[in-house]
Amino acid sequence: MLWQDKNSIVAPMSPALNNQDTIKTKLKYINTSFENASQLDWEIDSAGVINLGLIYDHERSSPNRANGHWYFQIQAEPGADLTLILKNFDNVWNGRKASPVSDSTNCLISEDGINWTAIPTDFITGNRLKFQVHMKGDKLYVASVEPYRLSDLEKLKTEISKNPLVEISTIGKTVEGRPLEIIRVGNPDAHYRVFIRARAHSWEPGGNWVVQGLIRGLLQKDGNSYLAG
């Protein structure tokens, strides 16, 4: 009820917030400030579910947009059981809607960012993925596929650079000035050549592991015969 004196009108004070309505969660933070992490928004609903909204990668001068890569770190109390929902998988490819997830999509978790374990997800209404995690420690990495980082690429180049069958050449630069490189494996005078592209998108790490494995396989002793012709 309002009351009034000669100089002012004063509204009644709002009732104090009910502490029972405060969301109780053992989550401390969703961290994305590290190499190859995917940017996202997140919030906790009234049931304590952590809702994560991936941010689309938009193609220049095109309606196309894509998501499919997620990589973040959960920081929470040890022993916590958390439920998470991932959304924003309404991709657009050549002007048509497409989705990178389904009822067969898995998720990967890791305590150290090196050793990964696959866990199931539930494909729920709204083209979303729902899954649960148990916090053995205070940090847990979550990803769509085992991430392939710039540091992984640098390690590979260092590993193979002195091999006489390898040549690493800079062929251009990215829009931010980073070098674009091509790795030749084999005899430069061979009659046949195969061109394989990797690292086209940061959110497509699976192909990077395949190409790295192919390079290592070809450079092994039993693989050299394929490089001679």
Positions of predicted regions on the chain:
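M14 metallocarboxypeptidase catalytic domain recognition
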Residues: 1-229
